Amino acid sequence: MRGLTPKNGVHIETGPDTESSADSSNFSTGFSGKIRKPRSKVSKACDNCRKRKIKCNGKFPCASCEIYSCECTFSTRQGGARIKNLHKTSLEGTTVQVKEETDSSSTSFSNPQRCTDGPCAVEQPTKFFENFKLGGRSSGDNSGSDGKNDDDVNRNGFYEDDSESQATLTSLQTTLKNLKEMAHLGTHVTSAIESIELQISDLLKRWEPKVRTKELATTKFYPNKSIETQLMKNKYCDVVHLTRYAAWSNNKKDQDTSSQPLIDEIFGLYSPFQFLSLQGIGKCFQNYRSKSKCEIFPRTAKETIYIMLRFFDVCFHHINQGCVSIANPLENYLQKMNLLPSTPSSISSAGSPNTAHTKSHVALVINHLPQPFVRNITGISNSELLSEMNNDISMFGILLKMLDMHKNSYQNFLMEITSNPSVAKNTQSIDVLQEFIHYCQAGEALIALCYSYYNSTLYNYVDFTCDITHLEQLLYFLDLLFWLSEIYGFEKVLNVAVHFVSRVGLSRWEFYVGLDENFAERRRNLWWKAFYFEKTLASKLGYPSNIDDSKINCLLPKNFRDVGFLDNRDFIENVHLVRRSEAFDNMCISDLKYYGELAVLQIVSHFSSSVLFNEKFTSIRNTSKPSVVREKLLFEVLEIFNETEMKYDAIKEQTGKLFDIAFSKDSTELKVSREDKIMASKFVLFYEHHFCRMVNESDNIVARLCVHRRPSILIENLKIYLHKIYKSWTDMNKILLDFDNDYSVYRSFAHYSISCIILVSQAFSVAEFIKVNDVVNMIRVFKRFLDIKIFSENETNEHVFNSQSFKDYTRAFSFLTIVTRIMLLAYGESSSTNLDVISKYIDENAPDLKGIIELVLDTNSCAYRFLLEPVQKSGFHLTVSQMLKNRKFQEPLMSNEDNKQMKHNSGKNLNPDLPSLKTGTSCLLNGIESPQLPFNGRSAPSPVRNNSLPEFAQLPSFRSLSVSDMINPDYAQPTNGQNNTQVQSNKPINAQQQIPTSVQVPFMNTNEINNNNNNNNNNKNNINNINNNNSNNFSATSFNLGTLDEFVNNGDLEDLYSILWSDVYPDS
């Protein structure tokens, strides 16, 4: 007879018949101190079968409980009564032994260790262990029986049976519960309780499901699916969450038809922008359906879904342009400027950096620089550039310095013309407009040249052990790319830089021995700058970092060493022990800002490796662990997060000088300059930004581990952190509104947007405690963006329209419009406050914001112009309008009456007014009323080409879309409707964002392009015939989203949901 013997001497033993979980969960206790197994007749019946007075088969769970879909429990009736009568002296030397069949057990145990858990930061339930049962499908959104018999070995998928481990745990839980129910807990009973709790804790720690590996090749629960997908099947939960928005349902057959991964690789595992992905939009849709009391979806809901979908048409088109910019920078720039034929050379500048062909392009771009403007701000003329053009390394360094000087001058220019109050230059003056155009023109030319020479330097050998100048150039370039929001190019250059700095040993102290200290400090600074950029990108994209912190042992920069931190490990372990001191306050603002940012990223990186990508919390085997095991992991996550937050708060205290400056109303009292005030404010935004990110990332881990019924403590913690995000958001609003220029508000939006998106994803919960003043501040931030008129006033100029700064501004403005709209709608619905009342309140108390609410809520207003104008599609979306027009697709989804109604309305132009708002709300800009679509004299643009796209017999589900298709550029379909009036655009033809055909080869199916072009030459009837005959030649994602009017008036959101998201979000 074997058993588990803890160190305190209490030993639990059972009889030889513990194979049955029912047998092992019922005990009778004699006065001798031994706990004996009761008669088999009693132990065969579970509690529910006893109540129903039906026969129980004694299995766990029993067949009757599975049929009734109820929890199967075996309580101790006789044993419980007898334990209460035990004399406390009779427990002396008590031994209770639990049989272990380690040879046949399905649970593999690592080396047993005694529980050494210290006091948790998160208070755990007092009856944690005894409150959980292990029966059936206890976790997941769709809990319930799968209707299979217990004897079915496939019920647990490829995981080995763990009934004996369940029996052991159930026995310990039952005994623990009975001991705690005793009227008087003496010393010996308390000791027994502690012993059993130790055994339970040890068992839960060592619970590791085993996989029947040999059967993976022969058995398939989901045909044609990956092994990872097969391992989702288990007996504990029907729904397996990988993120908050991505869930796999073992009962959802629709998922079997998809060949795409559940996790969208574009958004990664932990990106907060998952909310705006198709999965996130579907989750938002589901939440709205569950919370809305309307039988039909109001127009505002349809409009919101449309603009959220449309947002990615713009974003992914910009991503495609970034891919082209770094691959063929010179050709791409010259074509946009109409200086080259429309068909580019097949020779890439990256592939032949020193050819006469490439150098001739370099000369063309240099001669296209606006002079003497560039010489005035950089001090370098075209002739100087032409004389150095054959020296790649030298030319690369010169161009980087020019781009940096251009950046600083451009920022000062925009800060001056957007200063608040209105003492700025007149943005309509000819001189100001010409200067702005020159900045845009010069910036695009310089970045094209930098990309070209960066590609050239990849082919040069550099001995980095003696000369780190080129490494410094790469990090310099990364800083500029980050400022330009060139994310695609930034990622490519970063990969090269991290490879170089790692290869030459900058992260290891061993490579510094024997070096001159000044040279060694340069190397350290290079490493930590590369660390800064890499960790920032990993956090932004939600991917695991390429830098392993455990292998970093070089010293920290001088500022860290001056305050007592030698290396990364020293900092992580002791940061919370160091208080604010003169050593911090004596740092200059820029040094303290860099210290704070690098400190934050080290904490964030440590949290990522210890939780987000820790195998303990993300193992695929966790899907087949009982709820009590996963709940224990949940509390460990909360404990680690609380420890991380304590260290994070220490950084806030150490950098308190920056917080004091950022929140000060009068910076002159602190004797700081305008630049220092802006730097301090941006650090506070950076700090709050990463705190919100960590909370959001933790939410995804919680979704993975969460059981069906969340513990009250977990719910309380989630509410606390939601309030903290709300507090961060309100603080960020104050800082943004305190900037003295609108340009700084716009440039800080990257940090502000994270808190916005997290709050919007929890809009219905947050709206319950949001205040009217918060609504007003949010609208003020939107107004600050709206006041930056220089971009929209000059977008008809090709240099402005093609500039990266224009694209970045339009994305930020469109995104802010969307989140402001959602927050307003959620606030109005949750607070039962009519938005007209809020609008009236603002008119009376904040007259400078008059008309802004109407502007945001009216999708016909100029606020949505960048989203609603026809653009080249990314291929990310599907044409809902064509879905509804296609009879072959409609008939399976809609009833006969619905089909008749659709046919009746197909020829009508439906255009209902927006409830309680005037359609076509005018834009009020500083009191000047401008037409709704012709914004500042500019008509709505026409589509890029008048292509007709094919109609398809059916629309694929979301996960039948391939990622390569999602980012493919395509041409927009001509659309009609109020929001897309087909008027000849004032925009130059070369400003229509056309991407050369040969450049699209890696991203696009050329057959599809040829088919589209051929179809373009036929009349409408011929087009339809060709489309019907050759539909297989087109990608199923070659749809355009259509116009807003078509979507709102003809769209059926239930049909849309059933097609796009029914296989992503199982029905609750």
From Swiss-Prot:
Q: Which Pfam families match?
A: Fungal_trans, Zn_clus
GO CC annotations on file? cytosol; nucleus
Localization: Nucleus
Query: Has UniProt tagged this entry with the keyword Iron-sulfur?
Result: no
Residue numbers of the DNA-binding region are 46-72
Query: Which InterPro entries does the record associate with it?
Result: AtrR-like, Transcription_factor_dom_fun, Zn2-C6_fun-type_DNA-bd_sf, Zn2Cys6_DnaBD
Annotated segments matching region Disordered: 1-38, 95-120, 133-166, 1005-1029
The biological processes this protein is annotated with in GO are:
cellular response to xenobiotic stimulus; DNA-templated transcription; positive regulation of cellular response to drug; positive regulation of transcription by RNA polymerase II
Out of the domains of life, which is the source?
Eukaryota
Spans of biased composition, class Low complexity?
A: 135-146
The record ties this protein, via SUPFAM superfamilies, to: Zn2/Cys6 DNA-binding domain
State the Gene Ontology terms under molecular function: DNA-binding transcription activator activity, RNA polymerase II-specific; DNA-binding transcription factor activity, RNA polymerase II-specific; sequence-specific DNA binding; zinc ion binding
Q: Which residues carry this modification: Phosphoserine?
A: S21, S930, S942, S948
In this chain, composition skew of type Polar residues spans 17-31, 104-114
Q: Major place of localization?
A: nucleus
> Which keywords has UniProt assigned to this entry?
Activator, DNA-binding, Metal-binding, Nucleus, Phosphoprotein, Transcription, Transcription regulation, Zinc
Motif 9aaTAD: residue span? 1054-1062
Q: Which CDD domains match?
A: fungal_TF_MHR, GAL4
Q: PANTHER family under this entry?
A: HALOTOLERANCE PROTEIN 9-RELATED, TRANSCRIPTION FACTOR PDR1
Entry text on domains: The 9aaTAD motif (residues 1054 to 1062) is a transactivation domain present in a large number of yeast and animal transcription factors.
Q: What else is known?
A: Present with 1300 molecules/cell in log phase SD medium.
Q: What does this protein do?
A: Positive regulator of proteins involved in permeability. PDR1 and PDR3 jointly control the transcription level of both SNQ2 and PDR5.
Name of protein: Transcription factor PDR1
Q: Which organism is it from?
A: Saccharomyces cerevisiae (strain ATCC 204508 / S288c) (Baker's yeast)
Q: Lineage of this protein's species? A: Eukaryota, Fungi, Dikarya, Ascomycota, Saccharomycotina
Gene designation per UniProt = PDR1
